[in-house]
Amino acid sequence: MDKFDEKVIGYDSIKETLRQIADVLKRPEAYKEKGVSMPRGLLMESAPGLGKSLMASILMEESGRKSFVFRRINEGNTFLGEMKDIFDVAKEEAPSILLLEDLNLYVESNSPYAPEWACLQACIDETSDADIFVIATTNDTRYMPQSLLRPGRFDYILNLNPPLGKTAEDIVSYYLCDKNLAKDVQISDIVKAMPQVSCATLETVMNLAAINSAYRDHAHVQKEDIIDALLKVVYNLRKTDCEEDPQEHQMIAVHEAAHAVVGEVLHSGSIGIITIRGSHGAIGGMESGFAVY
């Protein structure tokens, strides 16, 4: 088992691409002998919390190269100069690898003509004769100029999607492995109740479930501990301190049950969770409950 499999659950095709890149960077002569032009960059795009930075750090470690990380920390006129400086340092230390974290935070506007993009493109082009491999991560490529995204600047562009199915179950199992789960809790039910959420969200939900369990003096992490955690973290639903109206609760329950019945008829086994709890504890209107399927 290599470090990609050791530290990252799922994402097999992504990991295989990263292994290939690492091999190219470690054994450049073997590839050059076959007439290969060395790749210059990798761009990883996904919603937050899906492991871009983790995978990038593993690639940097596996490459065996001198590594540098650059993030936008300061506002104002110094940023462009700092970006140029880090490219100069990476060039001096070549062969090297440079990680540009969170490109979406580099610019202050949604324009593809922003000066930050022009500066980044110039930095990449001006170091084209140096043995620098650039990794960049971003939450959104929509406002990046197409000229920056073309092969020759970023030869690899990888899109990470939220974990689904068995991968999501494996991630939940990993975060529950030391938390003494009750025997009647099914991992598949947990995943179905919060489809297409990030790895970081799964971790947060499982940790909060363990906190709920300990606070309630449960011997094991119970289903109610997990449900309360995922309703709060994933759906932003909390218990209300307002006076409850049993009749209104019943009406909402019937309404949501009807949604669930229709969902089950149309797609058997698709119902993930049903609740009458509303956003911020609200009862009534569009915030008065839902069914996930």
What are these regions (language model features)?
Residues 2, 106-108, 181-197, 205-208, ...:
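Short conserved motifs of the RecA-like P-loop NTPase core
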Residues 4-191:
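Walker A/P-loop NTP-binding motif of AAA+ ATPase domains
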Residues 7-12, 37-38, 113-114, 138, ...:
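Conserved phosphate/pyrophosphate-binding and hydrolysis machinery centered on Walker-type P-loop NTPases
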Residues 15, 117, 169, 203-206, ...:
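Hydrophobic face of alpha-helices
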Residues 90, 103, 175, 190-216, ...:
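AAA+ P-loop ATPase catalytic core
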Residues 161, 204, 261-265:
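Generic hydrophobic alpha-helical membrane-span motif
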Residues 210-293:
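Conserved P-loop NTPase/AAA+ ATPase motor core
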